[in-house]
Amino acid sequence: ATYKVRLLSEAEGIDVTIDCADDVYILDAAEE
């Protein structure tokens, strides 16, 4: 399965949606 993960930080001006497979650590996916 693949999940859509939204990273939101108003203070940092970040609003990103990433695809994250269920066998990948979310921090590893966020680094890519």
Curated annotation (Swiss-Prot):
Cofactor(s), names only, from the UniProt record: [2Fe-2S] cluster
Keyword Nucleotide-binding: no
Regions that span the bilayer: none
GO (cellular component) term, any one: chloroplast
Annotated localization: Plastid, Chloroplast
Protein's name in the database: Ferredoxin
Family classification: Belongs to the 2Fe2S plant-type ferredoxin family.
Top-level division of the source organism's lineage: Eukaryota
Keywords: 2Fe-2S, Chloroplast, Electron transport, Iron, Iron-sulfur, Metal-binding, Plastid, Transport
GO MF entries: 2 iron, 2 sulfur cluster binding; metal ion binding
